[in-house]
């Protein structure tokens, strides 16, 4: 089975070809429309996804009821709410499609079965989780150590699809700024591109 979505497994050097094939076969192709929820607050996640095509985001509602984007998922990334899926608890987050999306999905029971059957999958899982921990830690530090402009440029460099397809309000909440501030940052970058 050939799909760029599975590159995340192929990049792990220890999988044998037959293990990869079994993992790939365990994924089901699913399609969601723009605005569809993959997971809603209060529900328990029962599957994880690999985003094959499109753009999705996770968000929480703050104490005032405002949506705050916690993550943007781009093509070939794993879309998961780790705490809910593995601890079997209701999530505080929502995951929604910003555009029409195509995914590869694996349910929790199938994942658990393969995780215990294929030793390399558990090794891959540990490596993936530690890498995600690093990414989230780095993001939490950058909120305090980088200017809003630098955070915007960083997002533009890492995930240009977000800038292209996500509404301004969602990007602003992810960066920790107001819509007005983000509009000003964008205007400054257009009129003075060399300053940053």
Predicted regions and their residues:
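Short beta-strand segments in beta-sandwich/barrel cores
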Residues: 28, 37, 55-60, 78, ...
């Amino acid at each position: 089975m050939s799909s760029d979505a599975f590159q995340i497994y192929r990049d792990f050097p220890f999988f044998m070809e037959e293990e990869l094939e079994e993992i790939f076969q365990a994924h089901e192709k699913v399609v969601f429309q723009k605005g569809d929820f993959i997971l809603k607050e209060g529900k328990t996640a029962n599957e994880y996804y690999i985003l094959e095509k499109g753009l999705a985001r996770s968000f929480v509602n703050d104490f005032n009821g405002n949506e705050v984007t916690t993550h943007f998922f781009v093509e070939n990334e794993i879309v998961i709410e780790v705490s809910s899926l593995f601890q079997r608890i209701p999530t505080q987050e929502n995951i929604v499609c910003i555009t029409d999306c195509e995914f590869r999905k694996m349910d929790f029971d199938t994942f658990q079965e393969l995780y215990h059957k294929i030793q390399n999958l558990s090794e891959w899982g540990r490596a993936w989780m530690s890498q995600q921990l690093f990414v989230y830690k780095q993001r939490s530090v950058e909120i305090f150590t980088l200017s809003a402009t630098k955070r915007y440029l960083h997002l533009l460099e890492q995930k240009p699809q977000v800038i292209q397809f996500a509404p301004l309000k969602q990007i602003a909440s992810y960066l920790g700024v107001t819509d007005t501030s983000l509009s000003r940052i964008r205007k400054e970058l257009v009129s003075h591109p060399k300053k940053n």
